[in-house]
Amino acid sequence: MRGFGDQNNSKKKKIQNRTSYKYKIINLALNLHAKGKIPEALKYYEYCLNQGFNDYRIFSNYGIILKNEGKIIKAESLIRKAIELKPDFVDSYLNLGNILQDLGNFKDAELCLRKAIELKPDYAEAHLNLGNILKHLGQLEDAKLSYHKAIELKPDLTSAYFSISTLQYSNEDKIWRDQLFSDEILNKKSKKGQVDIYFARANILHKEKKYDDSSKFLQLANNLKFDLNPFNYENFLKKSRTLLLEMDKKILKKIELKNSSENIFIVGMPRCGSTLLESIISMNNNVYALGEINILEESYLEYKESKKKKRIDELYIEKVNKKTQLNITTNKWLYNYRYAGIISDEIPNSKIIHCYRNPLDNILSLYRAHFTKGNQYSSSLVNCAKVYLEQEKIMSIYKNKFQSKIYNLNYDLLVSNPDKEIKSLISWLGWNWQDLYLSPHQNTRAIATRSSVEVRSPINSKSIGGWKNYREMLKPALEILTQSEKYRKLLS
């Protein structure tokens, strides 16, 4: 017969075995993640959560994976749980700040990053990310200080050099400039790190008006980037053509509701002047700028998945209402140009503004942009030209069919004669004129696009004709464009 002591020892052993098993599984999940075996790590993370293993590392790492997969809301919940379990885990504040930034919640993102810095003052990446958020909020001098600190703490942090290279440049920046152009900075750098450095060098040389040298680094950067993120033009083309065919199908009987919200869609190519346009329109206090948000395509896909049981307009408005209660919104997901037919046919009280500029200025701006995600074609001048022409062709078809619904906004004319062009736009929108539309640089909204610095300055025409400084580099794009009769004059 076993005594009470034996029973207690047996219980202790079971608990010890259970604890040992728990940490064995957790460590296995963490090791798989560290080795880049994400699908296998995911299975173990999910198992750990199902078993109730309250280890902050599980919640944190699982959240990071989901963020990278675009599952932002679930990722936010997991990272917050990690912070709850271990309030002094600095990486969780960094990751939560990045997630909140993706969600457009810049103020809370700033607080998270300041908390990370409070916990770990020498955390270079936290200073870098704080700088990015401050830049989006228009606090450019403070952003610069954060970038300086990041470089001071970690002189080989390549993304910090790119970020600071997008701000105003002066003689005070000589120290980090020398580091940026040193041979040592490229030692043992990944391809991604090299891309950051080459783009940063190109930006500085551009500011110094050394355009030939800037061209060399732009080509190095984009060639490497294209290897990392190849682009399939045929797949891109197929999607545009498929949606063009959808226009001919009558999806539903549209009902124009007098009291329904006003939905303004800004479409065109990236770097076409759309951020300036959105800043102008959102000077109206009754307008909410949704920014670059892909909720129209999400609504369309949900409509298709529901086998047409739901209405596209209802799905879209439902998503808008989660963002704002204001009655007028701008949606600046530029690739909605592919959906211009569906917008015109299916979204009540919708207006489309097609923003465009000189194709070579647009292509140069794309090639210089260094987008962190999407827009893979921007690393190839040939693909930039092809996509530009395809976008123009698609929009001409939609304009012929929905002429009254689509406004043409020429960026070059806008910045050359803002008073005339903005008054014309506001009149087309049916709004009363306010002089504040002429001062979009005073708009206090957060801007998370590549134009976040330029748009903080008064309207100017400095970028018009900038392509001429890069004429030799742009020859591949020029050859594609001039196959179209419309652009033959560019050769002269």
Feature map (PLM): residue ranges:
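Short, well-ordered alpha-helical microsegments
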Residues: 337-340, 418
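Conserved nucleotide-binding/hydrolysis micro-motifs of P-loop NTPases
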Residues: 294-295, 357-362, 414-415
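Alpha-helical solenoid repeat scaffolds of the TPR/TPR-like class and their adjacent stem/linker regions
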Residues: 1-323, 386, 488
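Adenylate-forming
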Residues: 332-338, 390
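Short, glycine/charged-enriched secondary-structure capping and boundary segments
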Residues: 92, 96, 130, 280-281, ...
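PAPS-dependent sulfotransferases, especially Golgi type II membrane carbohydrate sulfotransferases
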Residues: 165, 177-189, 198-264, 311-325, ...
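Conserved phosphate-donor/acceptor-positioning beta-strand/loop module used by diverse small-molecule
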Residues: 343-366
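Short beta-strand segments
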Residues: 162, 266-268, 279, 291, ...
